[in-house]
From Swiss-Prot:
Residue ranges crossing the lipid bilayer per the database entry: 41-61, 65-85
Residue numbers spanned by region Binds EsxB: 721-1315
Molecular functions per Gene Ontology: ATP binding; ATP hydrolysis activity; DNA binding
Compartments where located: Cell membrane
Keyword Ribosomal protein (UniProt): no
Protein name: ESX secretion system protein EccC
Ranges in the topological domain labelled Extracellular: 62-64
Residue ranges occupied by any FtsK domain in the UniProt entry: 456-656, 813-1004, 1099-1282
Gene: eccC
InterPro entries: AAA+_ATPase, EccCa-like_Actinobacteria, EccCb-like_Actinobacteria, FtsK/SpoIIIE/SftA, FtsK_dom, P-loop_NTPase
Binding, ATP 3: 1119-1124, 1293, 1310-1311
Length: 1315
């Protein structure tokens, strides 16, 4: 049998017994009779004398008329005398009647006072000693077991009802002798005193503590009925801890007492048998004494102690074996009263005995006079209770037990009560959810105890709407720090979880500050969401707004689509009637620290109002909790908050805002004390239950040695021996201190995992990035397509997944798919530093690589973001990855893609290909082999760096973006902010991925939402639609750790590479470090043009055409390849011209060109200034002879027919050594402008040192002014711009910038010619 713990409250004050006295007034007295005859005679004598004289006067005349007149005079005289006497008598009677009336009226007023006092006296006595028929109602009231051993009326029991003196003393007046009193008034006084001095049928009680033995006799039925009534009152008002009621009866009479086995007062406190606690009903006093043991063994004689022993024992002896050496059969035991129904116990001390004679109508107290004769004193009518009535009361009391924390002298609200005690759960370690979650009556639905009220009764919070008998669906809880608010919320949520299944009730638990209020509840299947730590992550508040708003909409749509139900109540009613509808649990939202939430996000109040308005019908209940509540915070919401809980507040004003009174401010400081207010009911004071305290150690289900076998047995009074079996040695339990676990932890662990999974209202925030294998269809190797999602419909269609999109309103997270097949084919990624831009690019590349073959997509990467893209270089889809310092590869990459664009523009036109979609289709079907490329992606990580360091490439990439999309050329760019892209290219980026920006104001999605993208969360960003997303990790091993990302990418690249056996992405062709001269076009292929190398853009030959541009300049550091270039040019001249066509003169102070010309082409070689001057004079003379005369025709100028001879090539090496103050070449300066006409060519190579100043040297200045081609090789950038707009910088040997007026500036690699 389950038990119910009773925490006894402070005893209520009974009705007051009237006190005092009433002094009655004396009745009126009879008036005294006045006997003044002589005075009356004297008063009437003159009248009589006069009348007699008149009579005698008329009689003397003996006339008849006169005789009549005399008689009339005599008659009138006697009439006057009689009238006077009558008048005096009437006045006396009138006064006496008035006095009588006044006295009777006075007695009537006193009678009202006396009757009121009698009523109060009856109420007071019946409060303390109710009739047996009313005791059943006391069991379910706060008065159960209200009397404590320290109370004056402890162990006082009613035995019947009889007359008693009026509590207000009626004091009769002192009067004259009765014969002097007005008879009627005196009689009324006597009757008044006789009627009201006693009050009939008042409860008659005896104190069991005052007697060692009570011996009732008389009519057996009446005796048993009275004793049963006596026991019933004793059991109803006294707890089992204070009173024991035991029976010693013969077997024949034991059936009279079988009902007492249900009384908790008749159960042994520590001994158990097979049926439970041993029943204290025996057949002998010796056996009873052995069962009671020390409780009575060590007690003294009756009355020896001034403080009675506890607990008090009432022993009923009805036959049985009463041994004379029994302690109970002695003269009396302290704190023990024996009711002997059969005289089985020897009579000893008459002074401590009470004899009663009981008849069906009267009960008498029996005493003996000195002669030993019985003297009977009636006390009233005996109480009677049948066995059925007694057993009914006993069964009511059977489950109740006193709480161990009961402190009679203390306020019931001062102790802690566990939730399991309120729910009548004995062992929290052995919970059965199937039993706990059994269907509950509608009255108990959403109704749970949360603590004890001031009367010690469980206080239940009912969050149903008032129309269903509840307190309302929405409430408010305010409590200062240390008031126990968090504990109350935990208690409420845990109580609801223990009594309602997840099919009936779900929770959304929100803690704005991120405290531990709801910590540990994640395992409950009731919990749809636990949201904490919003204070530090305010963007999550908006996410919660969307989630809760979405849940309201979802419920509305579900009710409408399921059958257009008006409310959840109608929906559940249809389910119960058999409609095939899924469960739709009630949702209870508990929000702690809501006041601070509203301070941070005032707009959230609109959602609260919406829930308050629609939640009743949708089954969404709301409890708002906070430490403080400012006036005005609840504006618009307070009308929806039907119940309010006020724990101890910081101020009286806060208490008034919540409860309307300042009482919550005056609560004691101990946690859990509070007030509950709902509807128009008065405030209810309560103490919340405690669930965070340690729970008793889990009871051992198996132990070493004998174990009692559980059986189903009849519940009898006799001892039932348990069936014992031997148990094997138990396994050694792990050393675990169960007492360190809290009740909360134990219950949550017991309930975790039971019930259906709840609907997820709040998905976890985007904190843990997914991996690509989690977002893509199943991946596997394919012979035709490599490692991919083979067979998936979107494979190979330029779709890529790059992350997860958070849709809190829809309560789901979707893969973030990009469609790059159409106008959104260019991608821009913007985000502040360390926001995950490079990872986004890697994810995009990897995702496309997993869904396309290397023949379908190719990637060419410019990595200015720290080298992270280098990890993808081994992908078969990646043609090149160039880092910031790899300038050659960067330029070549852009040049290659640009060349591909130009090639496709030409091919598409020639072959009639109208779009890239057609091109893809033709390649896929094999109708067109193509150019070896598919969709080509030029990826630039950190666009600003490219603009700053490679400004010339910006225009090229802009052109690629403007023209390339229609030809399968895509650009993917990243930057720190959108403003770093010029408008010309930013508008072309059809797919924009916006990560966290340094300044949300620059967002191109939504500035307000951009501010909510969390900081220090790489990969978080906004979609075009304003949804938050999280970038996926570019790996396929399921590992979300950032620490192992490099290894994960390497594994992914290796997996993709090993699964592909076809051609890979064409690599970027680079300028060779060494270009053999033999690879240049021959004279037959190039004519008179002299090839000196190949350019970077197209890797095509670069020529010097001296017919067009007669001069050539070379600037370069030592050992950069200047002399090699001069040898190469010289060899080209010799190869293309005969000695008759061209002659060579060398000025070479360092003698590096001694062996260059071994043919007849060389006509001069100067290694010194003197030799050079001599040669220059000769050259000048020869050239001046070729100057055109003034009369030449245009045709002659074009054909140069006015002179004959060879072209003269003057080759100068180390010009810085030549161009001194006595420059031997200076005389030629005036001939340079006409050099083309006269066949003079200067080829000058100069060191880079001082080249900036050398530009103003006359010969170089004149050549530069003529826009002659030149080559700037490796040098120091401090020299400034030398040719065109080229500043020198470090370059490999043989490499330089070829500056020409027609083709602009090109980077070329000059050919190497072996000496």
């Amino acid at each position: 049998m389950s038990t119910v713990l009773v925490r006894r409250k402070e005893r209520r004050q009974p009705p007051q017994m009237p006190r005092g006295e009433i002094l009655l007034e004396s009745p009126p007295e009879l008036p005294e009779v006045v006997t003044n005859s002589f005075q009356n005679v004297l008063m009437y004598l003159p009248m009589a004398a006069g009348s007699a004289a008149m009579v005698f006067t008329f009689l003397n005349h003996r006339n008849t008329l006169q005789l009549v007149a005399g008689g009339m005079f005599a008659l009138s005289m006697f009439g006057m005398m009689f009238g006077q006497l009558s008048q005096q008598s009437g006045e006396r009677k009138t006064k006496l009647n008035s006095a009588r009336r006044d006295y009777l009226r006075y007695l009537g007023q006193v009678r009202q006072r006396v009757r009121k006092a009698a009523k109060q006296q009856r109420e007071a006595l019946e409060w303390n000693n109710p009739a047996p028929g009313r005791l059943w109602s006391m069991v379910m009231s706060p008065r159960l077991w209200e009397r404590r051993s320290s109370d004056a009326d402890f162990a006082q029991v009613r035995i019947g009802a009889g007359p008693q003196r009026l509590a207000v003393q009626l004091i009769p007046p002192e009067t004259k002798p009765v014969e002097d009193l007005e008879p009627m008034s005196a009689g009324a006084l006597r009757r008044f005193l006789r009627a009201h001095s006693t009050v009939p049928d008042l409860p008659v009680a005896i104190s069991l503590r005052s007697f060692a033995r009570i011996l009732p006799d008389g009519d057996p039925k009446a005796v048993y009925g009275m004793v049963r009534a006596l026991i019933m009152q004793l059991a109803a008002f006294h707890s089992p801890d204070d009173v024991r009621i035991t029976v010693c009866a013969s077997r024949e009479r034991m059936p009279q007492w079988q009902w007492m086995k249900w009384l908790p007062h008749s159960l042994h406190p520590t001994e158990y048998d097979a049926a439970g606690q041993v029943r204290l009903l025996t057949h002998s006093l010796v056996e009873l004494e052995s069962m009671l043991g020390p409780e009575i063994k060590d007690r003294g004689m009756f009355g020896a102690s001034r403080a009675p022993a506890e607990p008090f024992h009432l022993v009923i002896v009805d036959g049985g074996q009463a041994s004379y050496d029994s302690q109970i059969a002695s003269d009396g035991i302290d704190g023990v009263c024996v009711i002997d129904l059969t005289g089985s116990v020897a009579e000893t001390n008459e002074a401590t005995m009470l004899r009663l004679r009981v008849t069906p109508e009267r009960v008498y107290v029996v005493k003996r006079d000195r002669a030993g004769k019985e003297v009977l004193s009636s006390v009233g009518r005996p109480d009677q209770a049948s066995i059925a009535e007694a057993e009914a009361l006993a069964r009511q009391l059977a489950p109740f037990r006193t709480s161990a924390a009961d402190e009679p002298e203390e306020d019931v609200l001062s102790a802690n009560m566990t939730l399991t005690s309120l729910l009548h759960i004995d062992n929290p370690y052995n919970l059965d959810p199937a039993v706990l979650w059994r269907p509950r009556p509608q009255r108990n639905r959403l109704r749970v105890p949360i603590g004890l009220d001031a009367d010690g009764r469980p206080l239940e919070l009912d969050i149903k709407e008032s129309a269903q008998g509840g307190m309302g669906p929405h409430g408010l809880c305010i409590g200062a720090t240390g008031s126990g608010k968090s504990e109350l919320l935990r208690t409420l949520v845990l109580a609801l979880a223990m009594t309602h299944s997840p099919e009936v009730l779900n929770f959304v638990l929100v803690d704005f500050k991120g405290g531990a209020t709801f910590l540990g509840m994640e395992g409950l299947r009731h919990v749809s969401a636990i949201i904490t730590n919003l204070e530090e992550e305010l963007p999550l508040v908006d996410r919660m707004y969307d989630a809760l708003h979405g849940e309201m909409v979802r419920r509305q749509e579900h009710l409408r689509h399921s059958g257009n139900y008006a409310s959840l109540r109608d929906y559940e009613k249809a389910r119960m009637e058999g409609a095939p509808l899924p469960p739709m649990p009630t949702l209870f939202i508990v929000l702690d620290e809501f006041s601070e939430l509203l301070s941070a996000k005032p707009d959230f109040a609109e959602l609260f109002v919406m829930i308050g308005r629609l939640g009743r019908s949708l089954g969404v209940h709301l409890l708002l909790a906070s430490q403080r509540l400012e006036e005005g915070k609840l504006r618009g919401l307070d009308t929806h908050l039907s119940y309010r809980i006020g724990l101890r507040t910081f101020s009286a004003m806060e208490s008034r805002v919540v409860l309307g009174v300042p009482d919550a401010y005056e609560l004691p400081p101990s946690p859990g004390n509070g007030y509950l207010k709902f509807a128009t009911e008065p405030l209810v004071r309560f103490k919340a239950a405690y669930v965070s305290g340690p729970v008793d150690e889990e009871p051992q289900t198996r132990s070493e040695g004998p174990q009692i076998v559980r059986q189903v047995l009849p519940y009898l009074t006799d001892y039932i021996r348990p069936q014992v079996v031997e148990q094997p040695q138990p396994e050694q339990r792990a050393e675990e201190n169960k007492s360190s676990e809290s009740l909360f932890d134990v219950v949550v662990r017991q309930l975790a995992g039971h019930g259906p999974e709840p609907h997820q209202i709040w998905l976890p925030p985007l904190d843990v990035p997914p991996t690509l294998d989690e977002l893509l269809p199943p991946l596997s190797p394919s012979a035709a397509h490599g490692y991919t999602a083979d067979g998936w419909e979107w494979r190979g269609r330029l779709h890529a997944v790059v992350g997860l999109v958070d849709r809190p309103f829809d309560q789901r997270r979707d893969p973030y798919w990009l469609d790059l097949s159409g106008g959104a084919g260019h991608v821009g990624v913007a985000g502040g530093p360390q926001t995950g831009k490079s990872t986004m690019l890697r994810t995009l590349i990897t995702s496309l690589a997993l869904l396309h073959t290397p023949q379908e997509v190719q990637f060419y990467c410019l990595d200015f973001g720290g080298g992270t893209l280098a990890g993808l270089a081994e992908l078969p889809h990646v043609g090149s990855v160039a880092t910031r310092l790899d300038a050659d590869r960067i330029r070549r990459t852009v040049a290659e893609v640009s060349a591909l664009l130009e090639q496709r523009e030409q091919e598409f036109t020639e072959r009639g290909i109208d779009s890239m979609a057609t091109y893809r289709r033709l390649r896929a079907t094999g109708e067109y082999a193509g150019d070896g490329f598919g969709d080509v992606f030029l990826v630039v990580d950190n666009w600003l760096t490219l603009r700053q360091d490679y400004e010339a490439l910006e225009d090229s990439i802009t052109q690629l973006a403007a023209r390339g999309l229609g030809y399968g050329i895509h650009v993917v760019l990243s930057s720190n902010k959108w403003s770093e892209f010029r408008t010309s290219i930013r508008d072309l980026l059809g797919t924009k991925l916006e990560l966290r920006l340094g300044d949300p104001y620059e967002s191109e999605v939504d500035r307000k939402k951009a501010a909510n993208v969390p900081e220090n969360r790489p990969g978080r960003g906004l979609t075009r639609d304003g949804y938050h997303f999280l970038t996926a990790l570019p790996r396929i091993d399921g590992d979300t750790s950032a620490e192992t990302l490099t290894e994960g990418i390497a594994t992914t690249v290796k997996t993709i590479r090993e699964a592909w056996h076809g051609p890979t992405a064409p690599p970027v062709r680079m300028l060779p470090n060494v270009l053999p001269a033999a690879q240049l076009p021959s004279a037959a292929e190039s004519g008179t043009r002299i090839p000196i190398g190949i350019d970077e853009d197209s890797l095509s030959p670069v020529y010097l055409d001296f017919n067009t541009d007669p001069h050539f300049l070379v600037f370069g550091d030592t050992e950069c390849g200047k002399s090699n270039l001069l040898r190469l040019i010289t060899a080209g001249i010799i190869e293309r011209y005969t000695p008759q066509q061209a002659r060579l003169i060398f000025i070479d102070y360092s003698r590096s060109l001694l062996d260059v010309a071994t043919t007849e082409h060389q006509i001069g070689y100067a290694a010194s200034s003197t030799a050079a001057s001599s040669l220059v004079r000769d050259i000048k003379g020869a050239m001046e002879a070729r100057l055109p005369p003034p009369d030449l025709t245009p045709e002659q100028l074009r054909s140069r027919s006015w002179w004959t001879g060879a072209e003269l090539f003057l080759v100068v090496d180390d010009y810085e050594m030549v161009a001194t103050s006595d420059n031997p070449l200076r005389p030629l300066a005036e001939l340079l402008p006409q050099a083309r006409d006269i066949g003079l060519h200067l080829i000058i190579a100069r060191s880079m040192g001082g080249a900036g100043r050398a530009l103003y040297e006359p010969i170089i200045q004149r050549i530069k002014e003529m826009a002659s081609p030149g080559l700037v090789m490796s040098g120091n950038k401090d020299e400034g711009i030398l040719l065109g707009n080229v500043k020198p910088h470090k370059l490999p040997q043989g490499r330089g910038y070829f500056v020409e007026r027609r083709s602009g500036t090109r980077l070329i690699q000059t050919a190497y010619r072996e000496s």
